[in-house]
Swiss-Prot record:
GO terms, molecular function: UDP-glucose:hexose-1-phosphate uridylyltransferase activity; zinc ion binding
Species of origin: Kluyveromyces lactis (strain ATCC 8585 / CBS 2359 / DSM 70799 / NBRC 1267 / NRRL Y-1140 / WM37) (Yeast)
EC identifiers of the protein: 2.7.7.12
Keywords assigned by UniProt, alphabetized: Carbohydrate metabolism, Galactose metabolism, Iron, Metal-binding, Nucleotidyltransferase, Transferase, Zinc
Gene Ontology CC annotations of this record: cytoplasm
Binding-site positions, UDP-alpha-D-glucose: 60, 76-77, 166, 181, 326-329, 331-332
Protein name, UniProt field: Galactose-1-phosphate uridylyltransferase
Family: Belongs to the galactose-1-phosphate uridylyltransferase type 1 family.
Co-factor(s): Zn(2+)
PANTHER family xref list: GALACTOSE-1-PHOSPHATE URIDYLYLTRANSFERASE
Pathway: Carbohydrate metabolism; galactose metabolism
Note on how the cofactor is bound: Binds 1 zinc ion per subunit. Zinc binding seems to play a structural role.
GO annotation, biological process: galactose catabolic process via UDP-galactose, Leloir pathway
Lineage per the UniProt record: Eukaryota, Fungi, Dikarya, Ascomycota, Saccharomycotina
Catalytic activity: alpha-D-galactose 1-phosphate + UDP-alpha-D-glucose = alpha-D-glucose 1-phosphate + UDP-alpha-D-galactose
Length: 370
């Protein structure tokens, strides 16, 4: 008997985080009697007077939204980090060296923003036009440039802008209205910091950027590519943890949104739409995920720019159907991450789907014929 990647347990290395993932493809055959999520039906109206993100409504802070017609950004009234707060009083004491060694603390300052993708309450990326997603990409870019300028000219404590979206109740999203968030901190958060560290080490050892080599390898092998265009490709990473996890990778070395050409902005909007349509079509549901952008820090140094390579991570939880999700528990919390479906199997399923026609649009077309 020879080793079979589609049936035998093995571990795969993630060079971005210097970690390993256990792959157990034979477990995909096991029956499931556990928790099931509610199917993602979207019967919401275009506008909801009770939604604090819809145009013209009043937010919990008492501020009223304008009658916006495209994207809309506002400062989060309940931010995770704040600009105005005192620095912690850190005392140095030789008599308690153990406490100082183990109980480390530092203050964190910054600002948090909410980004409404559309004035329509019941839309998400896969049902938006490419031009509407393009407006979101431009908004991300404008926010990056604005905060970079404020840090430089007004000495605001802005170092890294983490843009992300939690879509669906399965990912903890409490509001259906299409929106994302942007948290700007005075330091680089742990996940991108780990990536930067490994990018620098890889280039020092091999003379090339890790993601440059990875993009070229995936383009050569093709088996994990879901879709691509002139500027970007979408892959299920070789080391993926979540069942249908993907990365959106720029084909050239672009440090951040700030360095995009107009064509690259168009291509990013196009590939986000293509990927998210495939996600919804997979189980014919509004597919939940957490998504985020990884890019250069604000006002990056020459070394920081060299280490950066723009990419996006999509982490969707659904595993077998619209109602069965993956949980990171037990061995995965105490040992290491584990997955059942191989990255290649997941990519095959996603690439077989349409990235142009949403399942609801197809359903409407079929119903109109009857």
């Amino acid at each position: 008997m020879s080793f079979d990647l589609t049936d035998h347990s093995h571990a795969r290395y993630n060079p971005l985080t210097d970690s390993w993932i256990l792959v157990s493809p034979h477990r995909a055959k096991r029956p499931w009697l556990g928790q099931q999520e509610k199917p993602g039906r979207n019967d919401a109206p275009d506008h909801d007077d009770k939604c604090y993100l819809c145009p013209g409504t009043t937010r919990a802070t008492g501020e009223q939204n304008p009658d916006y017609e495209s994207t809309y950004v506002f400062t989060n009234g309940y931010p995770a980090v704040k600009l105005e707060q005192p620095d912690p009083e850190l005392t140095v004491s030789n008599c308690d060296a153990l406490k100082e060694r183990l109980f480390k603390l530092k203050g964190v300052k910054g600002n948090c923003y909410v980004i409404c993708f559309s004035p329509k309450h019941n839309l998400s990326f896969p049902q938006m036009a490419q031009s509407e997603i393009m407006n979101v990409v431009k908004t991300w870019t404008n926010l990056f440039q604005t905060l970079e300028k404020e840090a430089l000219e007004e000495n605001k404590p802005y170092k890294y802008l983490q843009i992300f979206e939690n879509k669906g109740t399965a990912m903890g999203c409490s509001n259906l209205h299409p929106h994302g968030q942007a948290w700007c901190l005075d330091s680089i958060p742990s996940e991108p910091a780990k990536e930067f560290d490994h990018f620098e080490k890889y280039e020092h050892q091999h003379g090339a950027h890790l993601l440059e080599d990875y993009v070229n390898l995936e383009l050569r092998e093709k088996e994990r590519i879901v879709c691509e265009n002139d500027s970007f490709l979408v892959v299920v990473p070789y080391w993926a943890v979540w069942p249908f996890e993907t990365m959106v990778l720029s084909k050239r070395r672009i440090p951040s949104l700030n360095q995009f050409t107009d064509k690259e902005r168009e291509d990013l909007a196009s590939i986000i739409r293509n990927l998210t349509i495939r996600y919804d079509n997979l189980f014919e549901t509004s597919f939940p995920y957490s998504m985020g952008l990884h890019q250069a820090s604000l006002n990056a140094t020459e070394g920081e720019l060299k280490a950066a390579w723009f990419h996006m991570h999509f982490y969707p939880p659904l595993l077998r159907s619209a109602t069965v999700r993956k949980f990171l528990v037990g061995f995965e919390l105490l040992g290491q991450p584990q997955r059942d479906l191989t990255a290649e199997q997941a990519a095959d399923r996603l690439k077989a789907l349409s990235g142009e026609v949403h399942y609801l649009a197809k359903l409407e077309q079929e119903e109109s014929k009857t």
